[in-house]
Design a protein with these regions (language model features):
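Short beta-strand segments enriched in hydrophobic/aromatic residues
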Residues: 15-17, 66, 124
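Beta-propeller and related beta-repeat scaffolds in trafficking/envelope systems
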Residues: 43-51
Length: 163
């Protein structure tokens, strides 16, 4: 799916299990393009409650799975918005001068509804898990220190099509 593992990618998972059509329950966008699930992809049941929206009983991990599987890469920003299924255009847009280039948007106009919404921008090296959405859903950072933060130079922070 990803041709260049060193490239910047903009990934949006849009989830709404209330959708009657199974393939509309989880949508994946990569650099502004919707990914088409193959026939072998299992979608959640209609109205299924998923783990990351069960505030207080399940705490999401970012960059880790099953205790020992860790993400080997960089993350620039993570946003979770509860109670709505937003598409990629809420978070990014195609450049008007270069229509094949997908670039991130300023997220200050987003509405962070629901109890489990958060926005991690990783800008404060002394508090990498700080939620800047105003919801107060701060993360506890493990096995990282302020020296693990890489400063974004704001160059080449765009993506091309992934197909």
């Amino acid at each position: 799916m990803f041709r260049d593992f060193a490239s910047w990618y903009h990934v949006v998972f849009a989830v709404d299990t209330t959708q009657s059509t199974a393939t509309n329950r989880i949508k994946l966008y990569i650099n502004g393009e919707q990914y088409t699930w193959d026939g072998n992809t299992t979608q959640p049941n209609q109205d299924q409650q998923l783990y990351w929206n069960v505030g207080g009983t399940y705490y999401p991990y970012i960059g880790r799975r099953n205790g020992g599987d860790y993400f080997d890469g960089y993350m620039a920003e993570i946003v979770h918005i509860d109670d709505q299924q937003l598409d990629a255009t809420s978070f990014g847009e195609f450049d008007t001068n270069s229509p094949n280039i997908w670039k991130p948007k300023d997220l200050s106009d987003l509405t962070f509804g629901g109890n489990t919404s958060y926005h991690l921008d990783f800008e404060d090296s002394s508090s990498l898990g700080a939620d800047v959405s105003g919801q107060g859903n701060n993360f506890t950072v493990n096995n990282l220190t302020s020296i693990d933060q890489t400063t974004d130079t704001c160059t080449n922070n765009f993506g091309f099509g992934f197909n």
